[in-house]
Amino acid sequence: MASRVNVVIPTKSNFTGLAELLSDLSVDPAVDTICIVADGQNTYDTLPDPSDGIIKVVVPEGVGIHKMWNRGIEAVGRESHIAFLNDDVRLEQHCLSSLSDSLDNDPTIGIICPNYTSIDMNEDRRVLNTCGSRYDGTGGLAGFAMMLRSDLAKVYSFDEKLTWWYGDDDVLLWVTKTMGFRAVIAHQARCQHADSVTIRTDPPADFGRLVAEDREYFRAKWL
């Protein structure tokens, strides 16, 4: 049986997508605690009262997804594998159970994501970069649906000098370069991504400036 998985879901305004994702998670036996992190008080107040196994927390509006992820880690704890999911992702049956099994069975994998393409894979694929909106089989780790193994979750926090971008790149390089683990796309677990619904319909203020600043900081840190 797969190890239990805690789940962190940042959200702002895609309540339909969030409800669909929660429905997917409700039938996955590996899922333990789910934390919904609301981007601002208005979002928090709009969310329905949580059911069993679901908690909701709030961060000041616009502080960035890295602070949202860290707030979620604080809420669910660091004792289990942690999945970080966007609210515009749909998971196929037992997706997180499959990812958890992969982490349990291969101690060299530090971070893993489902196959998010329409291309069938016969084996897990090691990756050295991130998805980058490439859904044709050439993309890497999916920041919109990634799971960090428990022993790394115990010591990792997202870099809050970044705001909205490059967090998946940052954790990928930490896992592979700093800690010496592998990053993998799992061939048996699958998901579908609606490609940044919130960014397209309700983007952060100063979108271009924030992207540029995150890019400059990330490159100075790693490249």
Segments from the language model and where they lie:
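Conserved donor NDP-sugar-binding/catalytic core segment of glycosyltransferases
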Residues: 94-126
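Active-site donor/metal-binding and catalytic loop motifs
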Residues: 184-205
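Short beta-strand-to-loop acidic/aromatic patch adjacent to the donor-nucleotide binding site
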Residues: 79-90
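A short, conserved alpha-helix in the catalytic core of glycosyltransferases
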Residues: 140, 145-146, 151-152, 156, ...
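Short, well-formed alpha-helical segments that are part of the catalytic scaffolds
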Residues: 14-27
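Glycine-rich, basic loop-to-helix element that forms the pyrophosphate-binding segment
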Residues: 60-76
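Acidic donor-binding segment of Leloir-type glycosyltransferases
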Residues: 25-58
